[in-house]
């Protein structure tokens, strides 16, 4: 039981950092641009397809990933310029409808370019095996790499937001974008850059997800709702809140799906427990969100606004 708990805790952490990669861009976009954006799930899918294709073309896993990230950034920039710039002064319902349309557009575009069949991305031998995280506790090397990449990205985002001039502009735009614009900040360029960065983070999540699952149309959409839960729990506009909430949601979901069926087997039939347990684990996330909002209506770490 102890070894299983350790393994599933690492799985929960890996799922959490994957959610953080999506939620980080989502919370920046909503916090700074006041834009309700439903397209990150599609950008996860685009990142996965680009990475899989570029890995196949170059024959190098690392080179494929390195080329796919700026490619996804470019996709995000194009989406912001062509579609989103017309939505900033519109109400949130218009933004929801337009970005939902982006989901349909990207799904059909993927089917036209790559076809409806799933793609599969292999791993290089160096990260396809297992490593011992503790004596007698093997863990997949690629999942461990995802955790490390997620932690490094979290540190990088914190450094950019807290320690650089770009971060100062981002924080100024989040606090009071009208005042920042009056002081000479190019808000349009800032919005484009922020959305592009958010797209590249979502794309990176897709690149990491691709080798774990099949790459197929709509693959990022189930993660979108959880990413929204993450930013609501953590606090809209807060990178620190997004990271902590993503880890909490990842652990609750993963541990709940493994251990709730085991607990229920002592009360109900095994088949019933195996069906009800994962459903209860999914419910726990939303119960947790509701409980936190009762006591912290703006989330655990709300961004400061002026």
Where in this protein do the model-derived segments appear?
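Alpha-helical transmembrane segments within multi-pass membrane transporters and channels
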Residues: 59-102, 109, 244-249, 253, ...
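Hydrophobic core segments of alpha-helical transmembrane domains in multi-pass membrane transport
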Residues: 48-53, 69-75, 102-110, 149-158, ...
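Helix-loop-helix "hairpin" substructures at the membrane interface of multi-pass membrane proteins
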Residues: 15-16, 136-220, 239-244
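Transmembrane alpha-helical segments in multi-pass inner-membrane proteins
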Residues: 59-70, 192-202, 206-207, 212-286
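Transmembrane helix-bundle core of multi-pass membrane transporters
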Residues: 86-163, 190, 255-284, 298, ...
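Membrane-embedded helix boundary and interhelical linker motif in transport proteins
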Residues: 10, 32-78, 82, 263-273
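Membrane-interfacial amphipathic/re-entrant helices at transmembrane-helix boundaries
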Residues: 1-21, 50, 58-64, 90-95, ...
């Amino acid at each position: 039981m102890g070894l299983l708990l350790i393994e599933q805790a690492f799985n929960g952490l890996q799922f959490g950092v994957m959610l953080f990669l999506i939620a980080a861009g989502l919370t920046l976009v909503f916090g700074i641009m006041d834009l309700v954006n439903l397209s990150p799930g599609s950008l996860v899918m685009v990142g996965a397809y680009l990475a899989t294709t570029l890995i196949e073309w170059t024959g190098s896993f690392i080179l494929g990933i390195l080329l796919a990230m700026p490619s996804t950034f470019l996709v995000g920039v194009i989406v912001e310029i062509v579609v989103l710039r017309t939505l900033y002064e519109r109400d949130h319902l218009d933004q929801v409808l337009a970005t939902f349309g982006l989901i349909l557009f990207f799904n059909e575009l993927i089917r036209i370019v790559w076809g409806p069949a799933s793609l599969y991305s292999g791993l290089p031998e160096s990260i396809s095996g297992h490593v011992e995280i503790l004596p007698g506790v093997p863990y997949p090397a690629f999942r461990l790499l995802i955790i490390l990449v997620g932690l490094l990205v979290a540190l990088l985002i914190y450094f950019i937001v807290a320690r650089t001039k770009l971060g100062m502009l981002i924080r100024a735009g989040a606090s009071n974008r009208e005042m920042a614009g009056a002081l000479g900040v190019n808000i349009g360029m800032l919005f484009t850059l922020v959305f592009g960065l958010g797209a590249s983070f979502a794309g990176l999540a897709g690149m990491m997800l691709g080798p774990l699952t099949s790459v197929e149309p709509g693959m990022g959409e189930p993660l979108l709702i959880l990413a929204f839960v993450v930013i609501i729990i953590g606090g809209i506009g807060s990178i620190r809140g997004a990271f902590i909430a993503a880890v909490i949601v990842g652990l609750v979901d993963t541990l709940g799906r493994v251990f709730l069926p085991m607990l229920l087997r002592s009360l109900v039939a095994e088949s019933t427990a195996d069906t009800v347990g994962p459903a209860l684990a999914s419910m726990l996330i939303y119960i947790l969100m509701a409980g936190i909002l009762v006591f912290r209506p703006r989330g655990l770490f709300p961004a400061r606004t002026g």
